[in-house]
A protein has these predicted regions:
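Ligand-binding pocket scaffold of soluble enzyme catalytic domains
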Residues: 8, 20, 30, 35, ...
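Structured beta-strand/loop patches that form or line metal/cofactor-binding pockets in enzymes
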Residues: 1-34, 39-40, 344-346, 359, ...
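Extended hydrophobic packing segments that form well-structured cores
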Residues: 379-415
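Metal- or metallocofactor-binding catalytic centers and their adjacent structured scaffolds
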Residues: 28, 32-105, 414
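N-terminal amphipathic alpha-helix/helix-capping segment at the start of soluble metabolic enzymes
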Residues: 1-16, 22, 103, 107-120, ...
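Metal-dependent enolase-superfamily TIM-barrel catalytic cores that perform enediolate-based chemistry
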Residues: 120-247
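Conserved, mostly hydrophobic/aromatic
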Residues: 5, 31, 55, 93, ...
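Shared catalytic-loop signature of beta/alpha-barrel
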Residues: 25, 49, 53, 69, ...
């Protein structure tokens, strides 16, 4: 049976107020198609255009079973390689091709990766609050759900809400999320001290710096958080300054997770080979999909680096499912970020889309139960999309504001 690519379409939908790009690859075999995630929420139309105007003509009529060949073809065809636009576009098609292969084999994807080495995937959820009392109340709520790993923040990533320009800013300063990095460090250390005093050490805790402080300040924060036994400190430095991780490794024992913004192998190869990080945190669509993510996972395994794939709200359930399938077969799995795509969802509930709409658009979501996530055993990724429901939630072209982080003097800081 020769399986040829017959059509490629991009479905744009925003059921929870977040722009999602879903790729559908049709084949010449009746009823055989695959779905993948190409979501770059803040540039969704650019990714859609690249897929429909460039990658689709390149791939029509080609053998859908030759995933590696097609990935290399897409990766090299534009000459300049990598980057979030190209990689997300490639990812959508790559995931869809793996979905097709799983359906042809009548197996869930984890079986094609060698089978399960664990039955369920332990996840960490996000807990936030305006003060320590509210944060501890939210921690208790997650404990009752069976969660054993939590990412704790106070007021987001350390800044005031967008538009609240502080009095410390100069005249004429632009709106933004203003960050006082020194106060943020003091408050964060105090936060984890109080959390440990209240709940003890049975809960594994994570904190996301989100690259928002200078590298020397990140080292100071890491050292001061050591007594509170964090599971890891996430993205302490910007991807342009990861050379500072060597200094951090020499000065602190806190486990380091890095890589949310990586989209080029040069950004992670030396960090893993030199064991400067403990967890690799890439967003798999940002590096080109399942094909490169599997290679990265296997590479990291050789150096004792564990996976902790990025799992935010701004990726579709197809990408969440891809994470889970890789996790199930990965000996060096660490923990999985889980933004909570099922009710009760404490992350996306405040967005402008109707709560629960994601469940109407996507079917077959991975199941969360008592701290673990489970893939269903349907062939391929196991997730489908109802296009009629998806059409009810059109994407919007809006200016991204949460990335406009500013320091006290009004200058921009990496988000």
């Amino acid at each position: 049976m020769s399986v040829k690519i017959q059509d490629i379409r991009v479905i744009c939908t925003a059921p929870e107020g977040i722009n999602l790009d879903v790729v559908r690859v049709e084949t010449n075999q009746p009823g055989l198609y695959g779905l993948g995630c190409a979501t770059f929420a803040y540039r969704h139309l650019t990714v859609k255009h690249l897929i429909e105007e460039y990658l689709k003509p390149l791939l029509l009529g080609r053998d859908a079973e030759n995933i590696e060949e097609l990935w290399q073809l897409m990766h090299q065809n534009g000459y300049w390689r990598n980057g979030p636009i190209e990689n997300n576009a490639i990812s959508g098609i790559d995931m869809a091709l793996w979905d097709i292969k799983g359906k042809m084999a009548n197996m869930p994807l984890y079986q094609l990766f060698g089978g399960k080495v664990r039955e369920g995937i332990p996840v960490y959820r996000h807990v936030d609050g305006k003060d320590i009392v509210e944060i501890c109340e939210n921690i208790q709520r997650f404990q009752e759900m069976g969660i054993t790993h939590l990412r704790c923040q106070c007021g987001g990533y350390g800044g005031a809400p967008y538009g609240q320009t502080p009095g410390t800013a100069p005249r004429g300063a632009h709106d933004g999320m203003y960050l006082d990095s020194r106060k943020y460090i003091r408050d964060t250390v105090k936060l984890f001290g109080e959390i440990r005093d209240r709940i003890g050490y049975d809960m594994e805790l994570v904190h996301d710096v989100h690259e928002r402080v200078a590298p020397v300040e990140a080292i100071k924060l890491a050292k001061e958080l050591e007594p509170f036994d964090l599971f890891f400190l996430e993205d302490p430095v910007p991807l342009e300054q990861t050379n500072w991780l060597r200094n951090m490794r020499e000065q602190t024992s806190i486990p380091i997770a890095q890589g949310e913004l990586f989209n080029n192998p040069r950004e992670w190869k030396s960090l893993i080979a030199e064991q400067l990080i403990d967890f690799i945190r890439v967003h798999i669509s940002q590096i080109g999909g399942i094909t490169p993510a599997r290679k990265l996972q296997i590479f990291a395994e050789q150096f004792g680096v564990r996976t902790a794939w990025h799992g935010p709200g701004d990726m579709s359930p197809l990408a969440h499912a891809a994470n889970i399938h890789i996790d199930l077969a990965a000996p060096n799995f660490g923990v999985q970020e889980w933004s909570g795509i099922e009710p009760p969802n404490f992350v996306i509930q405040d967005l402008k889309g109707p709560h629960g709409a994601l469940l109407e658009v996507f079917k077959g979501l991975p199941e969360f139960d008592k701290g673990y996530v489970y893939a269903n055993d349907k062939p391929g990724l196991g997730v489908d999309i109802d296009e009629k429901e998806a059409a009810k939630y059109p994407c919007e072209k809006t200016i991204t504001t949460w990335t406009q982080t500013r320091l006290r003097d009004g200058s921009l800081q990496t988000p």
